[in-house]
């Protein structure tokens, strides 16, 4: 049964919200321009579909925020909203791209082999020696958030006006998944995913010395091993 996304319980968030890791420790005009370009996974909100754990589906103009790792969408009035029941989302398809919801965030699927898939999570995080001072005091749970702030996963409120010139990191992290179990990429995890190809995995690593934190190198290894 399909429903409009606007029929679900939602909360307002900022339209201008915000792991290989790129760090910007001295904010400047260029780093802030970069931040604007990576605060969402896709460059623009696009037609997509959400599939929930119970099998229900919803359609709308969607995108994925790289700070809160939640689906955002545009309602009929043009407001940017965040889906409050993101924990009930199983998958999302946006502009021909496929995403799996996991405890690590939304994983964009790049490679598949039967029940195994490989993908990446993109995340933006602020750098601070004192998170309490940078993010402010812990917030109370609320059904509606102000248009200038958003609650980070650590329970702190981020005020965009105060944080827009803060140092930050932009991180792309590869993941592997088998039988619904998602894990960061390691040699051991590769072998768990392809137990019958242990020798091939060890040989590939010995000959190519891939950086298992690099999305493209993991993708190439996945293709080679899954042949």
Outline where the language-model segments fall.
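Exposed beta-strand and adjacent loop surfaces of beta-rich binding modules
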Residues: 16, 47, 70
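Aromatic-patch recognition
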Residues: 58-182
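Sec-dependent signal peptide cleavage junction
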Residues: 19-41
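A short, Trp-centered hydrophobic/proline-enriched beta-strand micro-motif
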Residues: 41-51
């Amino acid at each position: 049964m399909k429903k409009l996304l606007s029929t679900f319980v939602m909360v307002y968030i900022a339209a201008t919200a915000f792991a290989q890791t790129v760090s910007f420790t001295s904010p400047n005009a260029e780093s802030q321009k970069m931040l604007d370009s990576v605060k969402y996974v896709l460059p623009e909100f696009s037609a997509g579909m959400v599939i929930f754990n119970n099998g229900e589906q919803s359609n709308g103009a969607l995108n994925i925020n790289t700070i809160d790792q939640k689906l955002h969408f545009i309602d009929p009035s043009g407001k940017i909203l965040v889906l409050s029941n993101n924990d009930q989302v199983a998958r999302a398809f946006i502009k021909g791209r496929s995403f799996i919801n996991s405890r690590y965030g939304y994983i964009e699927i790049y490679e598949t082999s039967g029940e195994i898939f490989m993908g990446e999570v993109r995340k933006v995080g602020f750098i601070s020696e004192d998170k309490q001072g940078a993010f402010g005091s812990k917030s109370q749970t609320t059904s509606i958030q102000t248009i200038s702030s958003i609650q980070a996963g650590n329970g702190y409120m981020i005020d965009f006006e105060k944080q827009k010139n803060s140092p930050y990191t932009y991180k792309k992290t590869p993941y592997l998944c088998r039988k619904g179990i998602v894990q960061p990429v390691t040699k051991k995890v590769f072998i768990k995913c392809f137990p019958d190809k242990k020798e091939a995995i060890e040989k590939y690593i010995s000959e190519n010395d891939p950086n298992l934190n690099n999305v493209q190198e993991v993708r190439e290894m996945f293709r080679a091993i899954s042949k």
